Curated annotation (Swiss-Prot):
May play a role in DNA repair. It seems to be involved in an RecBC-independent recombinational process of DNA repair. It may act with RecF and RecO. NCBIfam families: recR. Keywords: DNA damage, DNA recombination, DNA repair, Metal-binding, Zinc, Zinc-finger. Residues 79-179 form the Toprim domain. A zinc finger (C4-type) spans 56-71. The keyword Zinc-finger applies. Belongs to the RecR family. It comes from Nocardia farcinica (strain IFM 10152). PROSITE patterns: RECR, TOPRIM. One of its GO terms (molecular function) is DNA binding. This is Recombination protein RecR. Gene3D superfamilies: 3.30.60.80, 3.40.1360.10, 6.10.250.240, RecR Domain 1 (1.10.8.420).
Amino acid sequence: MYEGPVQDLIDELGKLPGVGPKSAQRIAFHLLQVEPPEIDRLQAALQKVRDGVQFCVVCGTVSDGELCRICADPRRDRTMICVVEEPKDVQAIERTREFRGRYHVLGGALDPLSGVGPDQLRIRELLARIGNQDDGVDVAEVIIATDPNTEGEATATYLVRMLRDFPGLTVTRLASGLPMGGDLEFADELTLGRALSGRRAL
């Protein structure tokens, strides 16, 4: 244990996802050794994120305005919605350049053991988008792109049940090829692109 502010910094860094005690200590001592202007830039970036970043009112991904750039782009195909768990998954699919529709971010996956049920996710908002037409356009296809793990599969199964009531709606799932138990964000562009183009109907 270190004293005072140093230990406070290590403790706060250790709360970040994927940062263990040793990594937190390394980052803390790196920050102690860099020049003050670099610390100022980091502090300014954190302040901008806290004050200026919000969630898109339509799809739920991160945005610097009410609408994200994807939802605001009239060239995107409004008949297709790709459902993902987190904003980072939007970026993973965008890197493939295979998808030209819009997204819907659930904000997680079903996980009863952690207290995450349908009411904690943005499922109602998804159903409303489809039922009310997305910007006046009928949604023809919903692509379920949840992670290929237990929680992601449970979420996909639940969504299929909810979406069956919409006549004429095609519901598809990313094709196999993604490693089971993995996260979408870690899949390479080629694998994810093939999974998207080879998606299967449910």
